[in-house]
Curated annotation (Swiss-Prot):
Signal sequence range: none
InterPro entries: TraM (IPR028140)
Annotated family: To plasmid R751 TraM.
GO BP term, example: quorum sensing
Keywords: Conjugation, Plasmid
Domain of life: Bacteria
Annotated Pfam families: Activator-TraM
Protein name according to UniProt: Protein TraM
Length: 145
C-alpha cells in the first residue's frame, strides 16, 4: 500500500506541480477510497458467487425437469408403440387365421366335390349294371316260358 501512496504522491507532483505529504487529507481520502473499492470488490465477488450458485441450481433443475419430461414422453411413445404393435399383431393373426380357414374350406370343398362326383358316377354305373342284370333276368325268364 505504501508503494501506491508513494507513486500517487509522485504523480500528483508531476501532473499538478504540488507537493503532497503523507499526512495530507487527499491521501487519506485516497486510502479510504481504495479501502471502499476493495470492500466493494469483495462484496461483488461474494454476490457473483451466490448468483453463480443460484444459476447452477436453476440449470440443474431445468436439466432434471427436461430429463423427466423426455422420459415421460419416451414412456408414452413406447406405450403407444406397444399398443399399436399389439393391435397390428392381433389384426394380422386374425387375417392369417381367416385366410387359412378359407384355404381349408376351399380345399375341402374341392376335394369333397370331386368325391361326390366320383360317387355319383359309380352310382350311375351300378344303376346301369343293375338295369342290365334285371333286363338279362327278364330275358331269361321270358325265354324259358
Amino acid at each position: 500500500m505504501s508503494d501506491q501512496i508513494e507513486e500517487l504522491i509522485r504523480e500528483i507532483a508531476a501532473k499538478h506541480g504540488i507537493a503532497v505529504g503523507r499526512d495530507d487529507p487527499v491521501l487519506i481520502l485516497h486510502t479510504i477510497n481504495a479501502r471502499l473499492m476493495a470492500d466493494s470488490a469483495a462484496k461483488q465477488e461474494e454476490i457473483l458467487a451466490a448468483f453463480k450458485e443460484e444459476l447452477e441450481g436453476i440449470a440443474h433443475r431445468w436439466g432434471e425437469d427436461a430429463k423427466a419430461k423426455a422420459e415421460r414422453m419416451l414412456n408414452a411413445a413406447l406405450a403407444a408403440s406397444k399398443d399399436a404393435m399389439a393391435k397390428v399383431m392381433k389384426d394380422s393373426a386374425a387375417q392369417a387365421a381367416e385366410a387359412i380357414r378359407r384355404e381349408i374350406d376351399d380345399g375341402l370343398g374341392r376335394q369333397l366335390a370331386a368325391k361326390v362326383a366320383d360317387a355319383r358316377r359309380v352310382a350311375m354305373m351300378n344303376m346301369i349294371a343293375g338295369g342290365m342284370v334285371l333286363f338279362a333276368a327278364a330275358l331269361v325268364v321270358w325265354a324259358s316260358l
